[in-house]
A protein has these predicted regions:
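Active-site environment of divalent metal-dependent phosphoester hydrolases
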Residues: 27-30, 46-50, 72-76, 87-89, ...
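Short amphipathic alpha-helical segments
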Residues: 33-34, 52-55, 79, 131-132, ...
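Core dinuclear metal-dependent hydrolase active-site scaffold
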Residues: 1-35, 79-155, 219-227
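Binuclear metal-ion centers of metallo-dependent hydrolases, dominated by the metallo-beta-lactamase
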Residues: 4-8, 77-89, 171-227
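Structural recognition of the beta-strand scaffold that forms the well-ordered cores
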Residues: 119, 158-161, 188-189
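A short, acidic, amphipathic alpha-helical segment used as a generic capping/interface helix at domain edges
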Residues: 143-149, 168-177
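Active-site metal-binding motif and surrounding structural segment of the metallo-beta-lactamase
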Residues: 26-72, 149-160
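Short active-site oxyanion
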Residues: 1-2, 62-65, 186
Length: 227
């Protein structure tokens, strides 16, 4: 399994017979192996998670399938599947499940080639100290936990989780809760706004003490990882 970090929350997961592209909006995409089926996921319509340019991929990789959150304004096509929160879809050899985001759209759980892959989109514990009221922060916490608790104890082979530097001292909350709530084997931070140093800080912190070896350090865009 090869993982390529594109930019922000965008990753490519290449398996033996399938290629998954998550939340692309900018960055350099490699040439995809045309012998493998390509699936493009977009978790919601925010500008840092979606770009309509993804629909051009169909011209260079025939047979691409799009799995998009329903809030995305997309063309009508048989190869475009729109999903709401808490829905399930089986397409080809993929089993796809969605969770309600605590912001907009969905998080994806994808079962393919005996792997369970999670991409959180903007599902995160969005605690904004000094910006939101205590009541707003409590509500954001509840939204996040209500979704993650639905997969409590689940075995996840590969997870992509927000680690947002803008949250100040609370940057770790969502990542930490997810790791403690699930049986996740490998976790990639995302949504860190090019603050690569935050990953090292988090891995060295007491918060990550019990799972630091499961966290993959990202150092630059288009970095590849063989797992």
């Amino acid at each position: 399994m090869k993982i390529t970090y594109i930019h922000h929350s965008s990753f490519i997961v290449e398996l033996k017979n399938h290629i998954l592209l998550f939340d692309y909006f900018q960055g350099n995409l490699p040439q995809f192996n045309k012998n493998k089926k390509l699936y493009v996921f977009s978790s919601h319509s925010h500008h840092d998670h979606f770009n309509k340019s993804i629909f051009k991929l169909n011209k260079i990789h025939p047979g691409v399938t799009y799995i998009l959150s329903k809030d995305i304004n997309s063309p009508k096509s048989e190869n475009i599947k729109l999903l709401d929160a808490n829905e399930k879809l089986v397409i080809d050899n993929l089993e796809i499940e969605t969770l309600q985001s605590s912001d907009l759209g969905v998080a994806f759980i994808v079962k393919v080639e005996n792997k369970t892959i999670y991409h959180g989109g903007d599902l995160n514990w969005w605690h904004w100290e000094g910006e939101n009221s205590p009541e707003e922060n409590a509500y954001a916490e509840k939204l996040f936990k209500d979704s993650v608790d639905k997969i409590k104890g689940k075995i996840i082979d590969l997870a992509f989780l927000p680690l947002d530097s803008r949250q100040g001292n609370e940057y770790y909350l969502g990542f930490d809760y997810f790791m403690r709530s699930t049986n996740t084997k490998i976790a990639f931070p995302m949504h860190f706004w090019r603050t690569y140093s935050l990953i090292k800080i988090f891995k060295a912190s007491n918060y990550a003490l019990n799972y630091k070896d499961k966290i993959i350090e990202i150092n630059h865009e288009n970095e590849e990882f063989q797992l």
